[in-house]
C-alpha cells in the first residue's frame, strides 16, 4: 500500500504543477484530464482492496470513482478531437475545458465569452431570473468536425445557428409559465433591453385584443464584442392577421351591388341554357332507352334499362328485379362519384393499396391516404439510444424505425443540421398513443409527417 500512496502523491504533485503554471493550451488541458482519470483509477483500486484513505484523502465509493473516471475519459476524447480541428491552437483555460462548462447549456459544446442575461417578469424588479449566454459556441457535427458560431439573444431566449438551423439552448417561456402571472417579460443584456410593447394597432369590433405585437430593443450602450441581440417581429409564434376590412363608402357599395347583380343574372342565364341542353339530351337518351327496353320486352329478355316497363302490359317480376338492380347501380355510381377523400384525410393510410379489382377511382382514393410518420432531430448517439429504449417500451405502436441520417447540400456533400430518424406507424391512432407516452431525451425535437409508401 506504500507504493499506492506514493503513486497518488506523485499524481497530486503533477496536478498542482498544472494549476500553478496557468498554461492555456490544449496539450496542458488534455494532460490535466488524463491525470484526473489516473487519480480515479487509483481510488477505485484502493477501495476494491479495502483501503479507505490515501494519505489525508478519503477514498470515495466505487460508483463515484467509476463515474468520475468515465467523465474524464469522455473529456479526453472531446479535447483530442478539438485539438485536431482548426481551433486547437486557440487559448483554452481550465475553466473553459471543465466538465461543468461543457455540460452547461448548450450541452456537449465548448463555449467562450459568458454573458449574464437578466429576465424580468411582469415588470417586477423582484421577479428576476439570471441566465448565462455565450458569445462563441464550438459544436461538433455528426462527422466529428468542429464549427465555431456566435451566440445570439432575442425575446424568446438564447440561441445559435447550426448551419441554417436555429437552436435555442435557453428558452424564457418555460420559466415565464412558472414565475409570471401575465406571461410578459423583459430581457436585459448589459444595458440593452428587449421587450414586447402593447399591440401596434387597435383591434376591430368583435375581434380579440391580441394583435400584432413587435419586439423592440432599446440600447443604452453597444453590446459586448461577439454577442448580439435579435429583434423579433411578433410576440406570439403564430402570425397575426395583418389586414382588416375597411368600411365601404356608399358609392363603392352601390357599384359593388350593381356588379354582383349583373354577375348573378349572367350565371342564371348560363345555368338555364345548360339546363335546357341537359334536358334535351336527357329526353333523347330516355327516348332511346324506352325503344331499347320495348324491343327487349317483346323478345322476353330480362330488362336492364331504367325505363324498362312495357307500355301496354303490367310490370313483370323480371322487369321489377332489373329495375331495382338498375337503380342500385346508379345509386352506387352516384355515391362513388360524389364521395372522395377529405383534405384532412389525405396521407392517413399506412398500407399499400392492393391489386384488387376495385376500379381506378377507388384505387386513387385509397392511395390518397399515406402512412403517418414522426421525424426526430438530434444528436446521432441520442437518437440511437432512444430507438433502443423505444423498441422495448413501444414495441406494438411503432411499425418501423429508420437508421439515423442527415441532409446534405444541393451542391456539396456537407451534412446540414442535426441527424434525423423516422418512426412509421400503422395508423394515426397509434401515432397519437405514441405521442402521449413519448419521452424524448434533452436536445431532441420532433415533427409529424406522411409518406406515399413505406
From Swiss-Prot:
Annotated Low complexity bias: 313-323
Keyword NADP included in the entry's annotation: no
Cellular compartments annotated: Host nucleus
Lineage: superkingdom: Viruses
Annotated spans, Transactivation domain: 1-201
Modifications after synthesis and translation: Phosphorylated.
Segments of this protein annotated with the region Disordered: 197-355
Basic residues bias (residue ranges): 234-247
InterPro entries to which the protein is assigned, alphabetical: E2/EBNA1_C_sf (IPR035975), Nucleotide-bd_a/b_plait_sf (IPR012677), Papillomavirus_E2_C (IPR000427), PPV_E2_N (IPR001866), Reg_prot_E2 (IPR033668), Regulatory_protein_E2_N (IPR036050), Regulatory_protein_E2_N_1 (IPR042503), Regulatory_protein_E2_N_2 (IPR042504)
One GO term (biological process): DNA-templated transcription
GO terms for MF: DNA binding; DNA-binding transcription factor activity; nucleotide binding
A Gene Ontology cellular-component term: host cell nucleus
Keywords: Activator, DNA replication, DNA-binding, Early protein, Host nucleus, Phosphoprotein, Repressor, Transcription, Transcription regulation
Protein family membership: Belongs to the papillomaviridae E2 protein family.
Function comment: Plays a role in the initiation of viral DNA replication. A dimer of E2 interacts with a dimer of E1 in order to improve specificity of E1 DNA binding activity. Once the complex recognizes and binds DNA at specific sites, the E2 dimer is removed from DNA. E2 also regulates viral transcription through binding to the E2RE response element (5'-ACCNNNNNNGGT-3') present in multiple copies in the regulatory regions of the viral genome. Activates or represses transcription depending on E2RE's position with regards to proximal promoter elements including the TATA-box.
Protein name (Swiss-Prot/TrEMBL): Regulatory protein E2
Protein species of origin: Human papillomavirus 37
Gene: E2
